Amino acid sequence: MAVPGSLAECGYIRTVLGQQILGHLDSSSLALPSEARLRLAGSSGRGDPAARSQRIQEQVQQTLARRGRSSAVSGNLHRTSSVPEYVYKLHVVENDFVGRQSPVTRDYDMLKAGMTATYGSRWGRAAAQYSSQKSVEERSWRQPLRRLEISPDSSPERAHYGHSEYQYAWRSHVVPGGRLTLPRYARSEILGLRQAGTARRPPGCGSFSDAVFDNGPLKPTMPTHPPGTSHSAGSLLEETTVRVSQARLQSTQSRTARSSWPRSSVRSSLREPGRMLTTAGQAAVGSGDAHGDRSVFADAQLGNADIEMTLERAVNMLDADHVPVSKISAAATFIQHESFQKSEARKRVNQLRGIPKLLQLLKLQNEDVQRAACGALRNLVFEDNDNKLEVAELNGVPRLLQVLKQTRDLETKKQITGLLWNLSSSDKLKHLMITEALLTLTESVIIPFSGWPEGDYPKANGLLDFDIFYNVTGCLRNMSSAGPDGRKMMRRCDGLIDSLVHYVRGTIADYQPDDKATENCVCILHNLSYQLEAELPEKYSQSIYMQNRNIQTNSNKSIGCFGSRSRKLKEQYQDLQMPEERSNPHGIEWLWHSIVIRMYLSLIAKSTRNYTQEASLGALQNLTAGGGPIPTLVARMVVQKENGLQHTRKMLHVGDPSVKKTAVSLLRNLSRNLSLQNEIAKETLPDLVSIIPDTVPSTDLLIETTASACYTLNNLMQNSYQNARDLLNTGGLQKIMTISIGEGYAPNKASKAASVLLYSLWAHTELHHAYKKAQFKKTDFVNSRTAKAYHSLKD
């Protein structure tokens, strides 16, 4: 049963875990026997105080022994922190963005001593700060007892983001204010009076294809997507290449450099004494000659002689006869090192036919060789589409998956999953990845690490850790953009959606909404909710939409001059009895379930990661697009049951323009429900007016946001005289008229939307006197420009 939390936990509720969890604690042996039993035992000669003390010590020792065995065998009580392991390593530094270097300053020993540790989230545009006053052991053994089941009452204070510049693996564009932003992964189109056209992309963002993450050039023709849906269209990017230190070149027995691989071109390396770390941007401005920078390293097995290693020599050593395994590993490590910072080196290795040789090394039952080969391949395919295709054509994906299932070396698994992430960024390989890798990745990584279906919490064990799970979710995030067929296959994958939902709910319950793997999971769910109505399997559509087919379309009553857009038909749709929810949803049923709706609203309120917020808003936007039972059910749930408007309206005032645009798009979909319009207007009208600029918007993103705001206001004004009067009283009409005029003879979407709104406002004859009193005249509302815009939407 849910019970309110303490004042310190405002916005959350707690639920009691099931009895089966308590069964694992097994601490009842700490209780002493009753005095009666002690006296009875005394008759056997063991009732003296010394015997009693001995029994207590024996019981304590037995309990500690059981706990020790439990920790070694079972991970049921273990929970991973969202802070990756490499953060605690003092000698590992992560440089994520050029222009901002914030090496980790706290290590594992400091955490054990109870000192505060902070780290950058390395994923969004801000660096979220985390701290801990407990030891790592305490946090890893603490069993969380809270589950967030409703959207919190209020959102936390939003972090303030400063000016920073980012460098990415692909083109970026500059927004007003000089801030460099990466192209968004998500694109949204809004449900209007008729299908909206395809939005223009910012320069350098690629094409609006049905692939979620495309980084190719703009295509001559762009497909039109169903209006009202949120569609991902940017590139998720690839995993970063791994830089190998000089010490690694000298000893192939050392571990590969640990790193996290976020969506930007992040490079991680081992800290070298007295040497600055090299980031992707620094490498880019350095030497690009694959042969000019030659590394000299000592190999003990070559008699400690200094050998000048080149790419040619390294590639030749990969398959030479009678070459010791240690030299093969060293050669692969050298290739990994060289291809880290030089795109020319990646191309040169391909020309030397090094990729087939590296793939052949996967057959060797040697962890060092496999690890080095996978690391080299991961760097070779980074930002190199030809190398990606080469790996795929050589049947590399099945080989990698085979090693992933067989090896017990965590570092090798990290290299493989990082390599698969890079491969999945290629549009040409996404379907191949879904066909060959989806099932294995789900069964081998996603399900076991998430803790589903046992109901356990996300945990690491001897075979998996957070970085591996994070890499796989990044790979699946790319794969979820593979178009309709790919989405359908992923929805049908048994256990995938269940595990993703279970993991996200677990991080929310642990007060970790900014977990970077959570962002990946939510983006996958967002993509899988795209076009959900149209792509539902037949068994669901037959049961859920049967009532839709039985609408009285043969009624003699007129349904209005605009067909399916008329008010009467909308009322018939919305008067339908909503389909009942299953108490135990499975698979695709999670996508529209009330638990997931609350999960999205919780992330909107609690997360400070822009992409997590945008994906959550976009998923709700997808689910509310359309006129069937599911969109209507979700809209009512968001507005009436879960108090979702308060969280959505706050997103209208965030600094990130894409989050703001997606929030307006969601409100536009919600405003199409007649029964919700007055409530939406009461809650959000001042906010919608406030985000409309005073002048004609000039950027594509601001144009889209302004157009969505005007269309939302139009939905709210059409059927309500009071809402139209409230709009007049806000003082926003002058801004709307300014935007309606636009830029002469080339009106954009925003000016067209403003014109439609003005034309609709004049239809309220009761307000004509109020308009004139406010110094407005009829021609401000009805003229050739507004009439043309209004009637063009009705055609």
Swiss-Prot record:
Pfam families: Arm. Transmembrane segments: none annotated. GO terms for cellular component: adherens junction; cell tip; cell-cell junction; cytoplasm; desmosome; intercalated disc; intermediate filament; nucleoplasm. A component of desmosome cell-cell junctions which are required for positive regulation of cellular adhesion. Regulates focal adhesion turnover resulting in changes in focal adhesion size, cell adhesion and cell spreading, potentially via transcriptional modulation of beta-integrins. Required to maintain gingival epithelial barrier function. Important component of the desmosome that is also required for localization of desmosome component proteins such as DSC2, DSG2 and JUP to the desmosome cell-cell junction. It is found in: Nucleus; Cell junction, Desmosome; Cell junction; Cytoplasm. The modification Phosphoserine is found at S44, S82, S132, S135, S151, S154, S155, S172, S188, S232, S265, S287. The keyword Repeat applies. GO terms for molecular function: alpha-catenin binding; DNA binding; intermediate filament binding; molecular adaptor activity; protein kinase C binding. It comes from Mus musculus (Mouse). Residues 1-318 are annotated as: Required for binding to single-stranded DNA. Its main location: nucleus. The modification Omega-N-methylarginine is found at R46. The lineage of its organism: Eukaryota, Metazoa, Chordata, Craniata, Vertebrata. Residues 245-257 have a biased composition (Polar residues). Residues 197-233, 245-274 are annotated as: Disordered. Expressed in cardiomyocytes in the heart (at protein level). Residues 258-268 have a biased composition (Low complexity). ARM repeats lie at residues 299-339, 343-382, 385-425, 484-530, 585-625, 633-672, 677-718, 721-763. Interacts with DSC2. Interacts with JUP. Interacts with KRT5/CK5, KRT8/CK8, KRT14/CK14, KRT18/CK18 and VIM. Interacts (via N-terminus) with MARK3/C-TAK1. Interacts with DSP. Interacts with DSG1, DSG2 and DSG3. Interacts (via N-terminus) with CTNNB1. Interacts with CDH1. Interacts with the RNA polymerase III (Pol III) complex proteins POLR3A/RPC155, POLR3F/RPC39 and POLR3C/RPC82. Interacts with CTNNA3. Interacts (via N-terminus) with SCN5A/Nav1.5. Interacts with ANK3/ANKG and GJA1/CX43. Belongs to the beta-catenin family. This is Plakophilin-2. One of its GO terms (biological process) is negative regulation of cell population proliferation. Keywords: Cell adhesion, Cell junction, Cytoplasm, DNA-binding, Methylation, Nucleus, Phosphoprotein, Repeat.
